[in-house]
Amino acid sequence: WDGTDSYYLPFESETYTAYTSSNIDFDTNILRYGYQSLTTPSSIIDFDMVTKSKTIKKEQEVLGGNFKKENYTSERVWATALDGTKVPISIVRHINTKKTADTPLLLYAYGSYGSTIDPYFSTVRMSLLDRGFIFAIAHVRGGEYLGRQWYEDGKLFKKKNTFLDFIACSKYLIKNNYTSAKH
């Protein structure tokens, strides 16, 4: 460390997956990392720590040739569980899909064994989004999305929190007009 101020990498979305990657040159100013979000295909990026510039080295191809990430939008919202705990929800939709009671929504969750459902890019999911669906991931307790305690608070005698979190997320999405109970 050279004593300079901290710097945070600028990510395009508030809900994403990022990880450091390998670089065979250990004496370099380049940080290589992987990045993807609900709207951005998996990418390998070189970040120059001196100039603060980035270069996309590789991005997952989306077959069909019609994909444009600017046609989709994602967000992170927080539902309040029965015990007052804030539960994150990652949401993605096509920009032409409005949040109304008539909009179909697929809510997905997995809260067990500490497994985390990252907000990742899926070409299969694009088919739903292009047909007017909203897709949401409820990051319920039982996974480790918010750390080890998040996992502990969703297992054994606290397992019911996983299901109560999912219900709270469903109610939040209905109350905030993303969809309705009929969907």
Predicted regions and their residues:
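Short beta-strand elements that form the blades of beta-propeller/WD-repeat-like
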Residues: D27-Q36
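Structural motif
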Residues: T39-D46
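Short loop/turn segments that connect beta-strands within beta-propeller blades
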Residues: W1-T4, M49-V50
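Cap/lid segment of the alpha/beta-hydrolase catalytic domain
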Residues: M49-S53, K58-H183
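A structural motif specific to WD40 beta-propellers
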Residues: S6-Y7, T55
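Structural signature of eukaryotic scaffold interfaces centered on beta-propeller domains
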Residues: S21-D27
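Coil-to-beta-strand transition motifs
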Residues: T4, T39, G84-K86
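Conserved blade-ending motifs and adjacent loop-strand segments that build the rim/top face
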Residues: Y7-S21, E61-K68
